A protein has these predicted regions:
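A short acidic, Gly/Pro-enriched loop at the edge of an enzyme's catalytic core
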Residues: 121-133
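Class I SAM-dependent methyltransferase SAM/SAH-binding core
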Residues: 69-122
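Conserved class I S-adenosyl-L-methionine
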Residues: 4, 8-63, 77-78, 100, ...
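C-terminal lobe and adjacent flexible extensions of AdoMet/dcAdoMet transferase-like proteins
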Residues: 222-230
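A short SAM/SAH-binding and catalytic strip from SAM-dependent methyltransferases
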Residues: 132-144
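C-terminal alpha-helical "lid/dimerization" subdomain adjacent to the S-adenosyl-L-methionine
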Residues: 28, 45-47, 163-221
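A short glycine-rich, Lys/Arg-flanked "PGG" loop and its adjoining helix->strand segment in the class I
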Residues: 146-158
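Glycine-centered, small-residue-biased loops immediately flanking beta-strands
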Residues: 66, 160
Length: 230
């Protein structure tokens, strides 16, 4: 798989992306939050997010030889769920989360999984490098979720799958207000609770094949798209 170093400045979200949430964050803030969460992330978030992870991998339908990029691999909690007949690359911005992932992958002997540290907003891969690009529980954790999807699309091969599993602002007026009110608090445990799904899809120019609520309670959405062939 070809790699290249992209010369980029630290990414700052544009005004359109900022309009998707009441909260604007920077990379250093995100890295600091997740470096602190690394030791307790699996304990706090593992059980409640696990059902969604299982549904996502079932829906993705990985076939032998698939090249999979997991954007936001975190502690590697997904790693053992991937079949050993695919080739998985996991990236994350947090060095502490990646260290947990390296320990887990080494302990389980997952030779089909490799890990790299990088910014999801500036992926250091050549165009069309992967068959599946999957971002679980990530896009409401980054400064510019739209730029993340642009990068996901760029590195996905034509006809490949772009998959997002995430919490988005509730469509109920009451719960939508609650999501917006909570977002300044939830950002300190790693995510913005008020990311707007219709606005996000429009700005990212994603035309989903399917959008499915997953987990109980159904607070998370699985969005599956494909990259155009032309």
């Amino acid at each position: 798989m070809a790699l290249f170093e992209r010369e980029t400045d630290e990414f700052r979200p544009d005004l359109a992306s900022q309009a998707l949430s009441v909260i604007a964050i920077e990379n250093d803030f995100v890295a600091n939050v997740y470096d602190k969460l690394a030791s307790v992330y699996d304990l706090i978030f593992g059980p409640i997010l696990h059902p969604g992870r299982l549904v996502a991998l079932e829906r993705i339908g990985i076939v032998p030889g698939d090249r999979v990029l997991e954007v936001g691999v975190g502690t590697g909690i997904n790693a053992s769920l991937y079949p050993d007949y695919c080739h998985v690359t996991g990236i994350d911005f947090s060095s502490s989360m990646l260290e947990k992932a390296r320990v887990r992958i080494g302990r389980k002997g997952l030779s089909h999984v490799r890990l790299m540290q990088m910014d999801a907003q500036a992926l250091k891969f050549a165009d069309d490098s992967f068959d599946i690009v999957y971002a679980p529980y990530l896009v409401n954790c980054v400064p510019d979720p739209v730029q993340v999807v642009r990068e996901m699309r760029r590195v996905c091969r034509p006809g490949g799958k772009i998959v997002i599993l995430n919490h988005f602002r509730n469509t109920s007026p009451l719960l939508s207000r609650l999501d917006r009110a909570l977002s300044p608090l939830t950002v300190h445990i790693g995510f913005k609770s008020d990311l707007d799904l219709p606005g996000f899809l429009a700005q990212a120019e994603l035309r989903p094949l399917s959008i499915e609520k997953v987990s109980v309670p159904p607070l998370w959405s699985l969005v599956i798209s494909t990259k155009d062939l032309h």
